[in-house]
């Protein structure tokens, strides 16, 4: 099953709403905190100009997730709501995804997000995710004007 502790951070890429004309700004950096590599997503999320997101995303096309039941993330941050976005072979358009939210505080916590509870972004998508069809995962600050500051220690799929 998939587990990532950011030891190979070249597999993750930063994406913002500027790809569609938005004005959100941000970046990802990798820090070592107590011997762990931490992905830090920071920025200013703006809904101006039809925008409203910054994220880091990783391709999962070559990973067998057929038996996955949940996404587990260990994270902390600035007491804001963040999201995990999953894309599948059925999310053809760039704005299609399945989402689940979690709210962080100033200490690292483990969040378990059942795949069956991810919500589709539009009516054209299947109601539920087939785990073997997952093609990417995104860690996302989304949907409202806010400052993002999210520290992620680990993310994985579990049975």
Report the location of each language-model feature.
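Beta-rich carbohydrate-recognition modules and glycan-binding surfaces
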Residues: 1-159
